[in-house]
Amino acid sequence: MNESNDELTLNNYLPSQVEQKWQKRWDSLRAFSPNPSDNGDPFCIVIPPPNVTGSLHMGHAFNTALIDVIIRFQRLLGKNVLCLPGTDHASIAVQTILEKQLKTEGKNSEDIGREEFLKRAWIWKEQSGGKIISQLKRIGYSVDWERERFTLDEKLNEAVVEAFNILHEKKLIYRGEYLVNWCPASQSAVSDLEVEMQEVNGYLWHFKYPLISDQGQILDKYLEVATTRPETLLGDTALAVNPNDERYKKYIDKKVKVPFVDREIPVISDIHVDKDFGTGCVKVTPAHDPNDFAIGKRNNLKQINIMNKDGTLNINAGKFQDLDRFDARKKIIKELDTLGLLTKIENYKNTVPFSDRGKVPIEPLLSTQWFLKMDNISSSCLKELDSKKPTFIPQRWEKVYKDWLDNINDWCISRQLWWGHQIPAWYVLKQSEDSIDQNTPYVVARNEKEALSKATKEFGSNLQLIRDKDVLDTWFSSGLWPFSTLGWPNINDADFKKWYPNSVLITGFDIIFFWVARMTMMGKTFTNNIPFKDVYIHGLVRDENNKKMSKSSGNGIDPLLLIDKYGSDALRFALLREVAGAGQDIRLDYDRKENTSSTVEASRNFANKLWNATKFVLINKTFSENCSLNESDEKNLELSDKWILSKLNQLNTKVSNLLIEYKLGESAKLLYEFAWNDFCDWYVEFAKQKFNNKETHNRKISEKILIKVLTDVLVMMHPFMPHITEELWHKLQIKPEQILLSLQKWPVLEKKYINSQIDKSFHELFEIIRLIRNLRVELGLKPSQLVPVYLISDNVELTNFLKTLIVDIKTFTKSSEVIICKSKDIDKNNFAQSFSGIIGDLEVYLPFNDFVNLEALKDRLTKDLKKVNSDIETLNKRISNKNFIDKAPKEIVDECFAKLKEGNLQSEIINKKLKLLK
């Protein structure tokens, strides 16, 4: 059934109605569900999966807009396009939410057990976890929702299990006791990348250890240390000094007594001790500090863990047992002071590692964990980078990626949580055994049946299997995302064969370490391919004060509020127009009280402009047959027709090239300028003149060109503003609803129309018209007051061109007549009482006449001059202030000088005009 054009001509633009209509229709027609056997080169983006706990923020909206522009553009180019969506299970975030829910019931996860906890997690995921997906749909994402994935889906879990087994078989995964970043809040290990370093105003505590004689007696001599963590002295197993430090050479191999725990520890030498830190003598706590752990390994020191997993002190802490680590710190300081062992407290700015999730200081803790060896994996990716695999856009992010690969550590991949991919490892115990330690043997398998077979083969039949309780780091499964979503490990899956490697990854710079590098390493390891050809890194969304938008800063914006007010097309286009270049941050203003944004409102106004332009075209359309230009039409094109067709095809070339290069902001700006200025403000006005002309043939040509240009603009605009362009395209084309603009082809480039000389001539014409309009405003003329205008030039080519458009100039400038002549043919003394201007080879004069109220004009110019001179005085005072020149940012100082120059020019112009009026 065809849609009625009457609906468009009668109704105003209501974004919510248009957007809901087309989102439903795209879904019902399965518009974005490609078949791998379809024609067209493959193009694939697998979207960064937002956390299932998340709700839409402006960063998501920005990322979505960027991805969707590229996806829709490539689809219009005729590619076989897959954009695959999904969500991440977000282990720690979900576990935290459920633990809080249990706390309100007076329970914890241990009370209800793993099975019941996971039941609750899945129920929560089904009820609340899909919120962000429904929000993403509001933006108009052209993804294949039928292929939507979740990182805990059965098939993706199979991929994770297979990956773990392969890595273990390659001896890249191992189990060992190491210092890990422990988050007492979530009671889980976290990776280095989940640690946020924060500068904290703290203290450096100095205290001393009594020396012990060779006979074992406590001496009245001491060695002093300085530390930011005095509570860890309870786990000290040595003091260390630099072997080249003359102050301490005599103490090497002596012993000291650790306060409170009655432990004798040696004084050792280690070249890595910094002689200039504190006293030059350091306490060594191998179980609670990475540097101390390394010293302990080199010197065979005992490792004494004093910490429980919840951040309280354990039995090794003696009388401080069960105290929270920070409460214990206070008590230990107090007692050291009482014992006369505290010597000094210094204010000290310290960089403290915080858990990104738990928001508490990390505790380095000895723990048996699963690790993934990274050296060989990262090396293979570094080799690929030599061949620009992947290519980073902008290129500067390649160095960040490379530096991380160059300085990589083994990855702790186990987490002490229940929600996630359970590690596919089973501990092998005798039937009589019931406890697991770090020496318990284990097997890694794809399922329990395989595990039992492996264990029986290696250890005999009288055994029991207990599966490891831990889950894998969320980033482990996310690292497989580009290919597990396409069917891997089944490399014969049609989707995998068609769309892997992916074409491009679009993401923020903040997860280059977390995610991008891990995907490249996993992809190279399991598929021998880098998983995407290009990596487009976008910037942050900032507010009008250039501050990063975030919920914690209180300046975050809910995109749905702006979508409800202005429409998703307006929000998308606003964000994209703000992109100055790949990787650049963008700014978005927002009035929280009024729920308004001038940036988004401008894009909504642009949508209205397109809507009204289409109304105009349809109202004035007088035929329903083929709208294509025929040979006869081409011969009868007027200059304005040739000009708009030239501009249209130049636009096509520029925009398509820019989009291929991911220059989305530049593309958006060009489309805006053409549609608003060239088409709506100029060509539509030319067309109106023709519609008033009785020559029906010219009118028909103009109608055809209006439809052609507007249609091509709608197609090129479609990736940016998909809903309104789909609606208007259907109105223009009178197409059945089953035919979609989304699935059409990019406009054919017609180079024959490109004419640089016509472009130049029309540019001059528009400058002339703008000048005349400005002069009329300065004279205070009303639109109804028609005055003559004189255009004087000896440039024959220019004057001949202007003469062909004299009627248009007269109409556009509200002139009674337009006189075009050479300078020798007119006496310029006649223009003594005129306002004038010069553009290139052309002089423009508007003589005064009875319409001009000279006294009112003098008053207005005098007021303008007073204001300009006042501004000049203020600026002169500012730049005369040495303090301002020395301390203000350079761009502010430069701006002041530029404003002063402009002010002086304005003052000179106004004074000249006032002279004319005397």
UniProtKB/Swiss-Prot annotation:
One of its GO terms (biological process) is valyl-tRNA aminoacylation. One of its GO terms (cellular component) is cytosol. It is found in: Cytoplasm. It comes from the Bacteria. It catalyses: tRNA(Val) + L-valine + ATP = L-valyl-tRNA(Val) + AMP + diphosphate. Its EC number is 6.1.1.9. Its main location: cytoplasm. SUPFAM superfamilies: Anticodon-binding domain of a subclass of class I aminoacyl-tRNA synthetases (SSF47323), Nucleotidylyl transferase (SSF52374), tRNA-binding arm (SSF46589), ValRS/IleRS/LeuRS editing domain (SSF50677). Keywords: Aminoacyl-tRNA synthetase, ATP-binding, Coiled coil, Cytoplasm, Ligase, Nucleotide-binding, Protein biosynthesis. Gene3D superfamilies: HUPs, Isoleucyl-tRNA Synthetase, Domain 1, Valyl-tRNA synthetase, C-terminal domain, Valyl/Leucyl/Isoleucyl-tRNA synthetase, editing domain. ATP binds at residue 551. InterPro entries: aa-tRNA-synth_I_CS, aa-tRNA-synth_Ia, Anticodon_Ia_Val, M/V/L/I-tRNA-synth_anticd-bd, Rossmann-like_a/b/a_fold, tRNA-bd_arm, tRNAsynth_Ia_anticodon-bd, Val-tRNA_synth_C_sf. Catalyzes the attachment of valine to tRNA(Val). As ValRS can inadvertently accommodate and process structurally similar amino acids such as threonine, to avoid such errors, it has a 'posttransfer' editing activity that hydrolyzes mischarged Thr-tRNA(Val) in a tRNA-dependent manner. Monomer. This is Valine--tRNA ligase. The lineage of its organism: Bacteria, Bacillati, Cyanobacteriota, Cyanophyceae, Synechococcales.
